[in-house]
């Protein structure tokens, strides 16, 4: 979702909404406390669960971190699966298995992207404990939850929160006065705070999203035609995508911003000229079958972890190994 400007500064609109934010915060704290104390039931989990989520509403780089974490788990000898809500899809309560050939209208865009990139079982559904159970029945011994930090009904063994280095915690206020889903104090109880971007304090667990060469959405090996392009973004933080295009030297004739998880139609991409159209990988998974597919490209990104993040995740997985009695 797009972030209102007043969420990034503590101005009059934010202060005017502070009473509503206080009510929202009280509800969040109460609900989490009820689950923690066992007054609301949380089903047992048959396998360890690692949640990768955020406090800040909107895009922070969470999905690339999930993909990287899955790779790390496999290197440690685990057989991971991914579970997600499937925002923008029709999975409902689920659980529904997602494969590389799934319809994004059913699975949602991010789960489909992860299914294609990670080659591990992916399940979606609003009932997170049920998706974890489905992953276990599929033969997995650890689950990574893409988002779900606030899904308190789902038991978890570790929590990783992702922050954007530029926006951090915005004006540090809760919804609707600010961008935060939970109080700032929640960060003290998570295992790792991973920061996406530059200009971060020394010691932060930082990572960078490194853009690569454009790839054709239809899967062909056509070379990038060059020249200026139409830049299309339907993600939570589109400015990061536009900055990545500039970083790799792709000129932008016009920007086209759509809502997060937007379901694209051919009309959305019907532009007056024949310039190439470049988009995010998350958008590309929904556009492969559109008539304009031969003009569509996406910009892949690879996560480059800093030393602190690599060490923190290594320590987390070592502790998880010991807890599960693995050698």
Curated annotation (Swiss-Prot):
UniProt source species: Halorhodospira halophila (strain DSM 244 / SL1)
Pfam family, one: LpxK
Enzymatic reactions: a lipid A disaccharide + ATP = a lipid IVA + ADP + H(+)
Function summary: Transfers the gamma-phosphate of ATP to the 4'-position of a tetraacyldisaccharide 1-phosphate intermediate (termed DS-1-P) to form tetraacyldisaccharide 1,4'-bis-phosphate (lipid IVA).
Molecular function terms, GO-annotated: ATP binding; tetraacyldisaccharide 4'-kinase activity
Top-level EC class: transferase
The protein, known as: Tetraacyldisaccharide 4'-kinase
EC number: 2.7.1.130
Gene from which the chain derives: lpxK
């Amino acid at each position: 979702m797009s972030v209102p400007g007043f969420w990034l500064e503590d101005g009059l609109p934010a202060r005017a909404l502070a009473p509503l934010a206080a009510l929202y915060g009280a509800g969040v704290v109460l609900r989490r406390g009820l689950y923690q104390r066992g007054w609301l039931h949380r089903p047992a989990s048959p396998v360890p669960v690692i949640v990768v989520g955020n406090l800040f509403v909107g895009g922070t780089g969470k999905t690339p971190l999930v993909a990287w974490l899955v790779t790390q788990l496999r290197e440690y000898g685990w057989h991971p699966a991914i579970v997600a809500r499937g925002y923008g899809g029709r999975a409902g309560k689920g659980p529904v298995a997602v494969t590389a050939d799934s319809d994004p209208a059913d699975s949602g865009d991010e789960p489909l992207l992860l299914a294609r990139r990670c080659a591990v079982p992916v399940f979606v559904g609003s009932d997170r404990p049920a998706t974890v159970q489905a992953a276990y029945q599929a033969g997995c011994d650890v689950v990574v939850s893409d988002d779900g930090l606030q899904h308190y009904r789902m038991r978890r063994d570790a929590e990783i929160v992702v922050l954007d280095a530029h926006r951090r915690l915005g004006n540090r206020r809760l919804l609707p006065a600010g961008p935060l889903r939970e109080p700032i104090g929640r960060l003290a109880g998570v295992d790792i705070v991973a920061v996406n971007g530059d200009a971060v304090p020394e010691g932060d667990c930082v990572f960078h999203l490194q853009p690569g060469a454009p790839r054709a959405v239809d899967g062909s090996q056509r070379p990038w035609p060059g020249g200026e392009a139409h830049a299309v973004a339907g993600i939570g933080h589109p400015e990061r995508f536009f900055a990545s295009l500039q970083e790799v030297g792709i000129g932008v004739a016009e920007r086209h911003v759509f809502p997060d998880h937007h379901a694209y139609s051919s009309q959305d991409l019907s532009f007056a000229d024949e310039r190439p159209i470049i988009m995010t990988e998350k958008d590309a998974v929904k556009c492969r079958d559109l008539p304009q597919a031969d003009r569509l490209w996406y910009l892949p990104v690879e996560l480059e972890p800093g030393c602190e993040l690599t060490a923190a995740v290594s320590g987390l997985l070592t502790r998880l190994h010991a807890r599960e009695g693995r050698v």
